[in-house]
Every structure is written in C-alpha cells, then in structure tokens.
Amino acid sequence: METMTSKAGEERRSVTAPSQPYDPAYDPLKSTTPGQGRDYAPTYWIGTAGEPPADDGPVTQDMDVDVVIIGAGFTGLTTAIFLAQEYGIRATVLEANRTSWGCSTRNGGQAQCASGRLKRSQWIERYGLDTALKLHAECVEGMETFKSLIKDIDCDPQPGGHLYIAHRDKVMPVLEKEARLLRDVFDYDAQILDGDTVKRDWVGDQEAAGAMHEPEGIGIHAGKLAFGYLRKARALGARVHPSSPVQGWETRDGVHYLKTPGGTVRARAVGIATGGYTSQSLHPQLKNRLLPILSNSIVTRPLTANEIEACSFRTHQVITDTRVLRHYYRLLPDNRLQIGSRSAITGRDAPQQKYEDVLVNNMVRKFPALKGIPLDYSWWGWVDVSHDMMPRIHQPDPSETIFYALGYGGNGVMYSAQAGRRLAQWIAGDGRQLDLPIFTSKLPFPNIREMVESQAFAPFRRFGQRFLYRWYYLKDEVL
C-alpha cells in the first residue's frame, strides 16, 4: 500500500499500488479470473491522467454490507454514485485489479448517443418503431445523464457532435437514408456532408466520400473521467476496494457470500459491472453470454502546425468511419492523433506487432502526411459485445438479488453512465417499471442469424469470429 500527501498537503491519502505487472496477453475466455492487483495497461489515458485518487484498500476481513458492485470501472462507479445520490445506499465496490483497470481506461474516449452496435434502422427492423423510438429516447436521456455527471469533472471534454465518415462512395446512399430516418422519424438533426465539404471544413481523411454529422458527441479523457468518478463515488460514501477479486460466490438464504483473497463479503444484493473483463467463472448467469472482442488503439506524438494543416484537421470532434470493423479517431486537446480499430482475436495473439502495424497503415491511408510519425502510446483492450449486439441492464432471475449491466459493444463511454443509473434503479428495487427489451431480457447465448440460440454454440464463437472478420473485410474493402 502506498501512502502519499494530497496536493493541498492537508490530509493523508492512500492509493493501492499494483502487486502484479500488467498482463498484455490476458484473455477473459481463457483466464479463470482477471488476476489480482494487476497494473494498468500502458495507455495514453493512464500516462497523462496524473496520480490515481485514494481508494479504500483491499478487503482485509469478513464484512457485512447491503450492496456490492463487482467492477470499479465507469459502470460500477456510476452505479455507486446513483445508489448514493438517488436512494441513499452506500455501496461497496470490489475491483480485482486497480480501479478502472479494464475497459474504462483502454477505450477511445468517445461519448456517442448510442449503445450496442445496431443503427436506428436496425432497431426498427428488430423491435418495431414504437420500441425503437423509446430506445432512442433512452440514449438521448443517457447523454444528458452523462453531461450532468461530467460537468464538475476535469476530463478535457471535446463537445460538438459526432462525424460519421463514409469510407467508400457506395456507402453514401445508405448513410443518406439513415440521416433522413434520424431527422424525419427520430427528430434527431443528422446532416449529410459531401466529400469535398468534409475534407475542406472538417478533416482531410483521404478516404472520405462524405459523412453524416450527428449533433451529440463528446470526446473525453478516459483516465481523468475514471478518476473523477472514483472521487465522486467515495465522496458520496461508497467504499472502493481494489485488489479484491471475487474468487468464489455462494448464495444462501438470500445472502450472497463473495469470497475475496482478504475475506468474505456478505451482501443482500450484487450488481455486476465487469464489462469485457467478465470471467466465465464469475457467476453461472453470465457464462457464455458475452463475446469479448479486442480493439487496438494508438496515439501519436503531438502533431506540428504543418502536420495539422496537411491533414486538414479543422475539428476536435469524435469521428468514426462506416466500416463494420470501424475506425474511431480524433485530434486530442494536445494535438496528438488517437485512432483505434479491431485487433487480434485471442489475448495470446494481441501483443503481436502486426496488429499495431495494420492500424498504423490504416492511419496513413487516411492521412498520408503522417507516414513515419512516431507513436507515443499503443495498447489494446477487451470490448464486451453481446450476441445480439445490444446491451442488457437486467435482473436475470427474479428470485435472486443479482443484477448486471453489460454488452455495450464499444459504445459504453456515454451509456455506462445511464446504465449505472438503471443498474442502481434495479438494485434499489425500482427496476420493474423499466420495459425496454434491454431491461426485460437476459443476455442471449450465441446464435445463428438470431434464429437459433444455444449455449452449445459457445465453443465455436471464435471460429465464427474469424470467419466474420474475413467477411467484414471483404464487405468493407472489396465488395
């Protein structure tokens, strides 16, 4: 345990130091647990966020609490915040490694008005118009929840919207149709830009055939946001225990016995907020219900004024392209370029240099002036994707006080705030009024074209993923 003086020098505070190094090959489908006390991944967010805030240290004895949240990332910490603010419940948050060690400090820092991986038109196809409109309202409300949470957190916000770039001419008719739908049906002011306008007034992405601009979208510093959530949760009375993985779980007479290395925590209710780092063994309700997918990210050294001009960067807004295996990127406040996309399929393969090389080549394809630019940061992380591409904030068994918020599919920076509010609502006994499919149904098992769902398909998930990646590449680049 490290102890240090606060900036004001008026009080002592403790930050739990790592006891194990970062594991670059960690794989949630192969590893029994995410480890204990592991250090952060070497991300830009961690490298520039400053010293982590104080925490409550590892669990060191048996204890009785009302509510346990498993996972101290964006979702777990916002759940603790809303439990305290809206219900007067002081949660105990258990984290296996360092606080916000997983998804929350390995993402691209893009807060978009979305969750899951489906477009609004796909919502209509799956759920019907009425439910699609309600899902959109949930995302719009979620963006307001997010804005309210971050207004007093110094997380380098870059507001202004989201630029969705068509990477090929053939994509433009589809993008134009989606924009009309957003305007006419969802009353959401999405505007179409032609390729020349994008390159002249927004960004000189050489692939841009046009773009759709959405009014909602904020770039944030993920590390500063995570640390801000931690400070806020603890100020409201939550206790946050890093280096305290749940290594065993029994439920007897309505009480959950959560075994950690330092003691057993007994709780009346448990919320699960473990994201892409959910181990298969955590609880039977979660086994085989997520497909963790790796995403790579790189950050360059700060661009010079000449490089910024050569790339025609006129915006700091968040940007993605229309590939199925999409790229997400933006110019950061310190004028570095951050860009991310798909990575390896297994944790064992993730450290291979070829995945960084592919991302660098794709960056140069978009911005030829950046060929040879040094990278200051390179990392990868696991994204929690559900088998139907939509999140769930749900109580899987009405007879058990177990709840989860999972499956954001790479759109969790914003929606984790709303999911935290909804998870708190469930835990506090107020969740029965939530009637959208993401609240009323379990995370599904693997399926074949959403027609046949079965846990028996689970061993073949990564075989299917390899096939889909090849198909998506052909769809994105060739066909």
Regions found by a protein language model. Name each.
Residues 181-183, 206-268:
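Helical element adjacent to the flavin cofactor pocket in flavoenzyme catalytic cores
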Residues 1-67, 85-86:
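Extreme N-terminal leader/targeting segments of oxidoreductases
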Residues 7-8, 12-14, 345-471, 475:
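C-terminal catalytic lobe of FAD-dependent flavoproteins
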Residues 65-93:
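N-terminal Rossmann-like FAD-binding beta1-loop-alpha1 element of flavoenzymes
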